[in-house]
Each structure stands twice: as structure tokens, then as C-alpha cells.
Amino acid sequence: MFRTLLSSTVRSIQLKPVTSTLSTTIPSITSIPTVSYFSTSPINYKTNTSTRTKENVHDLTTFLTLIGRNSIEYKDLFEDDLNKFLSTTSAQMKNMGIDTRARRYLLRWRHKFLNDLEPLREHKLGKKRNGGERKAKTVIAKRQALERLEEKEKWAQEELEAEKRGERLF
């Protein structure tokens, strides 16, 4: 019964060939290149329009003042010479006695300055909350435990004072 119903339905459907203009515009598979190439077009960077750019900084004092973080204290190590600062390597800065955090900061700004990537400004140091990410849970737990202990001692002191006044009879 089902076969006859199905076969009669199939016979009644007339399939018509569909012609499309798309089939003529699609390239054949053999014409697609198998090797992908990198773009050789120049990358368009945002133009730096600030006054704190490479063209406006001519001495090391100005540079160190603009980048902030008390970098001006290293001015004497470079003899206040911008070219000496720009040619100094990380190993030489380490031998001069510049600590790691400040050295990395100076090197990062030197790279940005030479390539004119960003206006000179101070990148503020982040502030740790609750002792930093790794110790946050223990610091919060200790703080809450101390608060509970202080609250318990305060309550015990209030009860003792109330008992001395005669407000509590035990």
C-alpha cells in the first residue's frame, strides 16, 4: 500500500531542469590556486598627531619626564644624552644598575619612541587588590576572620559592661 502510494507520488512530480546564469560564472576547481600568499600591501597605522612625538623630543630629560614613573632618576646614568640612551642595550642597562621593572619600562618606551608608535605618556603601575591575584582568597579570608574576631570581642565587651551596670542577670 505504502509503495504504491509512494510510487504514484513520485510519478506525479515532474522534475524540470534548472538553468542558472550562476553556473557559467563560477570558475572551475582547477583554477583555484593551491598556494596562499601573504599580503604585500603596506599596513596603515594611525597617524600620531600628538605634541609628545619623536619630532618634539630633543633631549633625554624631556623624554624621561614625559614617560613618567620617576624615570628621570636614570638621567645621570646616560649622561643626559638621548643618543646614548637610544644606543644602550638591556645588558648595559643592567650593568648600570637599573632594576628589572624600570629597565623593561625604559626599553619598551625606547622601542615605541624609535618607531613613533605612540605619544609619550606615563603608563601607571597597576595596584594590587587583596594581595594580588594568587593570594586574594587567603587575604580576604584572613580579613573576614579578623573582622569576625573583632566583632566577637566588641560584643563580649558590651555584654560585660551591661552586666556590670546590672542590665543583665545571669
Swiss-Prot record:
Q: Which UniProt keywords apply?
A: Mitochondrion, Ribonucleoprotein, Ribosomal protein, Transit peptide
Say which domain of life the source belongs to.
Answer: Eukaryota
Q: In terms of one coarse class, where is the protein primarily found?
A: mitochondrion
Q: Where is the transit peptide?
A: 1-20
One GO cellular component term: mitochondrion
Q: Give the UniProt subcellular location, in the record's own words.
A: Mitochondrion
What is the recorded function of this protein according to its Swiss-Prot or TrEMBL entry? Component of the mitochondrial ribosome (mitoribosome), a dedicated translation machinery responsible for the synthesis of mitochondrial genome-encoded proteins, including at least some of the essential transmembrane subunits of the mitochondrial respiratory chain. The mitoribosomes are attached to the mitochondrial inner membrane and translation products are cotranslationally integrated into the membrane. mS41 is involved in telomere length regulation.
How is the quaternary structure described?
Component of the mitochondrial small ribosomal subunit (mt-SSU).
Which protein family is it in?
A: Belongs to the mitochondrion-specific ribosomal protein mS41 family.
Q: What name does UniProt use for this protein?
A: Small ribosomal subunit protein mS41
